């Protein structure tokens, strides 16, 4: 739901992890 590894940022795309700019990232995320 846009939350991953303690992050709570809005995701611009449909992804489980999102970075500071709203980009999808998967570092530290185990699907």
Swiss-Prot record:
<protein>
    <recommendedName>
        <fullName>U8-ctenitoxin-Co1a</fullName>
    </recommendedName>
</protein>
<keyword id="KW-0738">Voltage-gated sodium channel impairing toxin</keyword>
<feature type="disulfide bond">
    <location>
        <begin position="4"/>
        <end position="18"/>
    </location>
</feature>
<dbReference type="GO" id="GO:0090729">
    <property type="term" value="F:toxin activity"/>
</dbReference>
<keyword id="KW-0800">Toxin</keyword>
<keyword id="KW-1015">Disulfide bond</keyword>
<keyword id="KW-0964">Secreted</keyword>
<dbReference type="GO" id="GO:0017080">
    <property type="term" value="F:sodium channel regulator activity"/>
</dbReference>
<comment type="function">
    <text>Blocks voltage-gated sodium channels (Nav).</text>
</comment>
<dbReference type="Pfam" id="PF17492">
    <property type="entry name" value="D_CNTX"/>
</dbReference>
<keyword id="KW-0528">Neurotoxin</keyword>
<dbReference type="GO" id="GO:0005576">
    <property type="term" value="C:extracellular region"/>
</dbReference>
<feature type="disulfide bond">
    <location>
        <begin position="11"/>
        <end position="24"/>
    </location>
</feature>
<keyword id="KW-0872">Ion channel impairing toxin</keyword>
<keyword id="KW-0960">Knottin</keyword>
<comment type="similarity">
    <text>Belongs to the neurotoxin 03 (Tx2) family. 06 subfamily.</text>
</comment>
<dbReference type="InterPro" id="IPR035285">
    <property type="entry name" value="CNTX"/>
</dbReference>
